[in-house]
Amino acid sequence: SYLPYQKGVYFPSTADKEKISVGAERQRRYRVIRKLRSEPTEEHLWETVLLYCGVQFKTYSGLPFTYEIRKGRSGEYTKELWIDRRGKSKSLAWSSVLLALGNIKKVGEVVERPKALSDIRGVTYIYGMFYRFGLIDVPKEVKEKKNDRGNKKQKKGREDMLEENIKFFRRL
């Protein structure tokens, strides 16, 4: 090959994530999310969950987590998500995810808290995933937690700097 690139855009949709470019991966995610939102079925959800392996999500309280899906002896994916939070893995059964999907009344509806989806093990992780996939919406306070970047000291430092800038420009 004449090109020094290891990743490309022009691979079939079945190509591994390692072979496609970041832009192509983003396009795949966009398409699968659009399909899931228009028709929230088990197949579309499974396709979305597979594409989002390794992507960081946040729980209801704003704690980050990722998940992976392992392959079984036959080479097929197992229907079990392994949630990785601070180096510890917890398993989440696919049936729990489907139960929560069945409890969503309307796509885009505001769900106040994770337990509103269902009283199942791992629902805080499912809540974060469904919000990211656009299946549910969350209250404003929760959005602020999920979008909060940095710790409180950094935030306080940014606020102090902003106040100093405002005072400086008022003097001019």
Positions of PLM-derived features:
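BZIP DNA-binding basic region
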Residues: 1-31
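Intrinsically disordered, charged low-complexity linkers and terminal tails
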Residues: 23-172
